[in-house]
Structure formats: structure tokens, C-alpha cells
């Protein structure tokens, strides 16, 4: 296919048009008085949202060169979302400001490579200073403030804070759609996995159709059990203790299952059999997790262990186990605290190393199950459109809160970026590198300008006053007052602000050093091509 090539100024101008088209659509959502954007959906009702990355992903421009510019800025939003989970609109606004200012200077004759060097220098200083003014997040109240600012909803803030308090910072918090109008929190304590009882005859509560075992022994194996003789020795030891048994195996069937059911019905012995969770290597890892949590051993031939010679000391313990048709929950496993902590650290290291998003998700689930539990925020709303918009906001708020716990918080509302302005301005460089520093300085003002603009105010006036205020004092666009931002709970996670600035500068520097852009030439529509002559088809009647 033939290619269309544009060079230097012409190429950069075309890409800038694309950058502006996308950024102008995204930046109207910034701040407490930001507006919404309506996105057309091929099927179903339109999506109304103020989430920067969702809007950025939807934008496709007809002109190939403009579209490339738009996609580069969409990449800034997407990368910031991946790293910090929020701050996508701020990142887009910063990128647009840097690209615009940068192109003005490059057009005027500045060397793009020198400009890039200055920008990198300025961003490094800005990030160091952001870390210096960052404050660690402490207590449920601070967590609630971060979440409330991100979701623009205090109720959501307190829900997320409660969820994090209940399941810990490593706990899994999932967001689901509810059928009701209200948003609620549901917490599953202990380790839960998605396998239920092997037979409904094993239930102890026939109303709820669940089996509840108090202080049970837990036998964990990766073998399939069909013959009761294999587990008879250990069963007899458990019966002597007068305790119930949870049997986790690859499968329990045939004579073994029948014997367990008959003994349960006769009241001789209470045992519940469940299949092991997961598949393949993940199953082995999950069985190992259960064994660490309960203080037992995995009876597997890989370790030279045999079911027939299993002793009661090799079984795990827990204060309670609840088994339903679909799930098994182990509460308060009797495992060694140090071993559990070591296992948690091992899984954390695997999370850091893995490149697969799916593997990372599964590892984080395992981490949460060992570390404390799972919380589910069930989002409710009056209409489907409102539900989708609310769900996106809560996801952002949750990501934002996690980022705050990780790296601390800074003053919100664009204040922190202006707070580091003077330190960046003090950096001295020569020639085009100084131009690069000036570009970053101008960009640092842009988020607060846009927040003020969206609130119907003049951004320049707000910026100039903010530069002369004490660090931490900022403009609350929601009320129009000058306040101590952290005291009022108007905060941003340091990680979000840092990621937005780094990613914006990275893409802006790349675009400024672009000298040629190559795109596919649009195909000419062959106007009257139609179908080839099919006159010979007339003779097909003879085929009948």
C-alpha cells in the first residue's frame, strides 16, 4: 500500500491538531465543576462520563496524521491509568500544554533535542520536590477524603475507606453492578475459593443449604480419592478427636464419597469434601496457600507423601469453615503468622515480576485471600446510564486511594504542581535546555488554569495568587474559597500527580523530536467499478 509522508513543521502541525482535538474533549471534565462527555455506543444507550481515559480511548479522527497525534495523547492517559489508576485528565492537560509550547519554540528555531534535555531536567526536579512535600496517608478519615475527592461523592469515600479498613491495603476490593438503587459494601472475611460441596447430603443447615464446620481438621491433597481405604487411617484419627473434617482433593467420588455421605447421615462423623480450586500450576500454588494459612501440609506425591500414611499432625486447622453449593470459605486459619507473612512477600515479588495482566490479577487475588479477605462494592443507580458512569467513578476512586496509600498525598486541585514551580524555576540551564525548562514551568500552571476555567473563572489570576501563597494553601473551585487544601481534605495521591507529569513529558518530548510522519494513503473509491461483466451467466439455464 502507498504511504503518505509529511516532514518537520507540516508533520508536527498535523499531529498538534489531533492532540488539541482529543485534549479539548477531555479537559472539560477537570475539577469539581468539570462537565461530562457523552459517548455514542454502537449498541445500547450512550455512555455519559467524566473519566479522561474512557473518553480518550473513544476518539478516532478521520485524518491519519491528526489521529496519530490524538493516539499519542491517549497513550499518556492510558499509561497514567495503568500505573496510578487515576489522573488521566491531568496527564492529558499537561501533555497538551507541553506539546503546544514546545512546538511554538521548535518552529521559532529551537533545537528539539536541547529542548527535550531541558524538559527532562525540569521534570526530575519537579518530581523530587513532589516527593518532599508529600505526606503519608494515615487513618480511615484520610483514605475517605482521597476517595471522596476522586469520586466527587462523600458516601463513596466512606465506603472505600471502610472496605480498605476491613480487608487491609492488600485486600481485594471488587466493584459489581447491583440490582438496587443504593451502593452497598459486602465483605467476605477469610479465604474463599470457588468450589462447593461434592454432595448436597453434606449440608448441616438445610434452610441455607450450607455446611458449617466448627474447628475442623483440613486434609489438603492434589490426588483423586475414590477408595475410602486410602484415607481411612487419618479419618479414624480425626473421629477420635471428635472434630469435623474438610477434605480438599482433586476429586472425591465413588465408594469414598458414598462412605462419607452415609457416615454424615448416620451422625457418626461430619465430613465435607470439596474439589481443589484452580487448574494446573495455579492449583498447586493455591493448595500451598491453603496449607500455609491453615498450618497443614499438601499431601502430594511430588513431596513423597502418601495418603495412607498421613498423620493428624499433617492436617490444617481453622476456627470455622462454611461450604455452600459454589464456594468454600475458611475463617481464621491456624497457620504460623511468620510463614503466612513470608508467603505473602513471595507472592508480592511474583506480582512485581510478572508481565502478564491476567497472571498479575490472579496473584493479587491470592495475595488478598492470604492477607485478609475480599470486599465487594455493589453499585446501585436509577438508570443503566447512571450506573455505568457511577461505576467508572468508583473504580477511579479506588485506584486513587490505593495510589495514596502507596506513595502518600499532596495538595489537590492542581495546587501541588504550582507549589513545586519555584524550585523548578531555580534550575539553571543554557540555550535550548532553558527553553525546555520554561515549557515545563508553563505546563505546571495548566491544570489549575483549566480547573478555574471550568468553574467559570479567569485562570491567570488564580495562578498568580497561588504562586505567592504558602505551600498547601490553594483554591477550592467547588466553593470559590482559598483554603488549606490538606486540612479541608482536598488532596491528590502523589503517585497520580507524579505519573501524570512523567508520562506527559515523555510523550511531549517524543513528539517534539519528530521530524517525519508516515501514514497509509487513503484508498481512492473506484466510483463506477461495480461487478465484472457476467453476461455469460445467461447460459446457466442449461445446467438445470
From Swiss-Prot:
GO terms for molecular function: ATP binding; ATP-dependent protein folding chaperone; isomerase activity; unfolded protein binding. Transmembrane segments: none annotated. Signal peptide: none annotated. It holds the Pfam family Cpn60_TCP1. The keyword DNA damage does not apply. ATP binds at residues 29-32, 86-90, 413, 476-478, 492. Its EC number is 5.6.1.7. It catalyses: ATP + H2O + a folded polypeptide = ADP + phosphate + an unfolded polypeptide. Its main location: cytoplasm. Disulfide bonds: none annotated. One of its GO terms (biological process) is protein refolding. Forms a cylinder of 14 subunits composed of two heptameric rings stacked back-to-back. Interacts with the co-chaperonin GroES. Together with its co-chaperonin GroES, plays an essential role in assisting protein folding. The GroEL-GroES system forms a nano-cage that allows encapsulation of the non-native substrate proteins and provides a physical environment optimized to promote and accelerate protein folding. Belongs to the chaperonin (HSP60) family. This is Chaperonin GroEL. It comes from Bacillus velezensis (strain DSM 23117 / BGSC 10A6 / LMG 26770 / FZB42) (Bacillus amyloliquefaciens subsp. plantarum).
